[in-house]
């Protein structure tokens, strides 16, 4: 079992979204996530939480965003109780399985200025 945590300033992600426009959205967020964030009226807190969650996951796995691992390999969805969970694909899924990992748990939270995510992989 391993743990990963990430915290990000919401202002940082807000700036990246505003300055990067659709290029940032398309690089970092899946089409499902982009619908939840809503580019017409962006939910910067949610976008920041998703960013922190993806960073926390690669920290828990210990691989980072290199060697073919992309932000798009990680999708955040919500179950019937609105709890977030990951759908992992691509190179990251290969690494996850290759390390003998089978499951994960995700928690995301935010306040006015920061978003934080904690991930446990096991």
Curated annotation (Swiss-Prot):
Q: State which gene encodes it.
A: acpS2
- What's this protein's family per the entry? Belongs to the P-Pant transferase superfamily. AcpS family.
Q: Provide the alphabetized UniProt keywords.
A: Cytoplasm, Fatty acid biosynthesis, Fatty acid metabolism, Lipid biosynthesis, Lipid metabolism, Magnesium, Metal-binding, Transferase
This molecule's function is given as: Transfers the 4'-phosphopantetheine moiety from coenzyme A to a Ser of an acyl-carrier-protein. This isozyme may be involved into a specific lipid biosynthetic pathway that also includes Z1545, Z1546 and Z1547.
Identification of the protein by name: Probable holo-[acyl-carrier-protein] synthase 2
Q: What class of enzyme is it?
A: transferase
A Pfam family hit: ACPS
Annotated Gene Ontology cellular component terms: cytoplasm
* Subcellular localization: Cytoplasm
Cofactor (UniProt): Mg(2+)
Keyword Lipid biosynthesis applies: yes
Under Enzyme Commission nomenclature, its number is 2.7.8.7
**A single GO molecular function, which one?**
holo-[acyl-carrier-protein] synthase activity
Q: Where does Mg(2+) bind?
A: 6, 55
